[in-house]
A protein has these predicted regions:
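A general structural motif
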Residues: 55-57, 94
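Short, surface-exposed ligand- or partner-binding patches at beta-edge/loop junctions that are enriched
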Residues: 99-101
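Rhodanese-like catalytic fold shared by cysteine-dependent sulfurtransferases
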Residues: 2-8, 18-45, 50, 69-96, ...
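Short, glycine/acidic-enriched loop or turn micro-motifs at the edges of active sites
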Residues: 64
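Structural scaffold elements adjacent to functional motifs in cytosolic proteins
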Residues: 59-61
């Protein structure tokens, strides 16, 4: 009988806690080896064409500030991934967004977060691929 009471108590406690976990989808920590499913990648060549054509877009580096200050794609502003929800609230929903990070997992996740927030044009471009194609980077300078 005691075993049954303990089992039912544990079951009830699990049900009581479950809704609080279900309300917030996990975003962090991000698996640094996987891209977000469904995020659209922009090639470095496509990004260069956007820059050369004077296309209106916002390039957002989602790396931590220390990494951004060491190296980023020219013209990027810094909104670290951990602050992306708040940062997106300050940007008009019709803005074309291109996210960047070192290898892609953070920026692809940011693109999906922006899409879920109502932005319709979101892509990402890894900084490593940008550099592999011979493009220059710069130190981020307090742009956020």
């Amino acid at each position: 009988m005691k075993l049954l009471i303990v089992a039912l108590s544990l079951f009830a406690a699990t049900l009581w806690c479950a809704p609080s976990f279900a309300q917030q989808p996990p975003r962090f920590p991000i698996d640094q080896n996987k891209l977000a499913v469904g995020a659209k990648e922009k090639t470095p060549e496509e990004l260069k064409q956007m820059m050369a054509n004077g296309s209106k877009f916002m390039l957002i580096d989602v790396n931590p500030r220390a990494q951004f200050e060491k190296e980023t794609i020219p013209g990027a502003v810094n909104i670290p991934l951990e602050e992306i929800d708040e940062g997106l609230k300050k940007i008009p929903k019709d803005t074309v967004l291109v996210f960047a990070c070192n290898r892609g997992p953070r920026s692809s996740q940011a693109a999906k977060i922006a899409e879920a927030a109502g932005f319709t044009s979101t892509t990402f471009c890894p900084i490593m691929k940008w550099k592999e194609e011979g493009n220059k980077t710069e130190a981020g300078k307090g742009k956020s």
